[in-house]
Swiss-Prot record:
Subunit structure: Homodimer.
GO biological process, one term: dTTP biosynthetic process
Presence of keyword Transmembrane: no
Binding site for dUMP: R21, R126, R127, R166, S167, C168, D169, N177, H207, L208, Y209
Presence of the UniProt keyword Methyltransferase in the record: yes
This protein's UniProt keywords: Cytoplasm, Methyltransferase, Nucleotide biosynthesis, Transferase
Protein name: Thymidylate synthase
Chemical reaction(s) catalysed: dUMP + (6R)-5,10-methylene-5,6,7,8-tetrahydrofolate = 7,8-dihydrofolate + dTMP
């Protein structure tokens, strides 16, 4: 994951000091891209230990169309708790938009089912897209989508995906986002009888929070290790039937975890 460390260095050296919604302050650049060949290994950061349970359960939660933290809490995942209301609700965030986008005529559009249909029937389409950025519902969301828009692409029997992330917390959020979308590509590829290709990450406001600087320098002092391998143990009937125990990460040998505060 040298690309990830190189991004950290770039922001430290070239970033602009900026104020932000949380009041924490950041060092920021605008516009950056990284490409990960998923044939080379699973892109999980090794210079600190990442919490795999949270990454996998969060993605399964999105895929289920869920927007309440109860499922996450039942599985010892607390990454969304700070934004939930007293009932655990987050409003129409990712899961709602991915699985039941509300159309003007009252229809509920399942973007992910549409993607699967397109990949099977028209894999050369340039419209195989999922958007979480629903302008009409942003004010009802506990947190506006950071990873807002992604597109699939098929070439030579391989499935690739590009994500546009409008706002990126490099230290805490980005390792999760890369691993989550890489996992999604593997799952969709399995369901569509494709091999995996590239995951392309594109960032808008790409930043390090001022209270993550010590942790960033510690991480940069560590040498990256070999990427692990993702094993999917079974093929469920649909994309929406995967379970946590279906996934195994082989050969993950990270440096110790590094704690840092979340900007809310």
């Amino acid at each position: 994951m040298k690309q990830y460390l190189d991004l950290m260095k770039k922001v430290l050296e070239e970033g602009t000091p900026k104020a932000d919604r949380t009041g924490t302050g950041t060092r920021s650049i605008f516009g950056h891209q990284m490409r990960f060949n998923l044939q080379d290994g699973f892109p999980l950061v090794t210079t600190k230990k990442c919490h795999l349970r949270s990454i996998i359960h969060e993605l399964l939660w999105f895929l289920n169309g869920d927007t309440n933290v109860a499922y996450l809490n039942e599985n010892k995942v607390s990454i969304w708790d700070e934004w939930a209301d007293e009932n655990g609700d987050l409003g129409p965030v990712y899961g709602k938009q991915w699985r039941s986008w509300g159309a003007a005529d009252g229809r509920q559009i399942d973007q992910l089912k549409n993607v699967l249909t397109q990949l099977r029937q028209d894999p050369d389409s340039r419209r195989i897209i999922v958007s979480a950025w629903n302008v009409g519902e942003l004010d009802k969301m506990a947190l506006a989508p950071c990873h807002a828009f992604f597109q699939f692409y098929v070439a030579d029997g391989k499935l690739s995906c590009q994500l546009y992330q409008r706002s990126c917390d490099i230290f805490l959020g980005l390792p999760f986002n890369i691993a989550s979308y890489a996992l999604l590509v593997h799952m969709v590829a399995q369901q569509c009888d494709l091999d995996v290709g590239d995951f392309v990450w594109t960032g808008g406001d790409t930043h390090l929070y001022n209270n993550h600087m010590e942790q960033t320098h510690l991480q940069l002092s560590r040498e990256p290790r070999a990427l692990p391998k993702l094993v999917i143990k079974r093929r469920p009937d649909t994309l929406f039937d995967y379970r946590f125990e279906d996934f195994e990460i082989e050969g993950y040998d990270p440096h110790p975890a590094i704690k840092a505060p979340v900007a809310i």
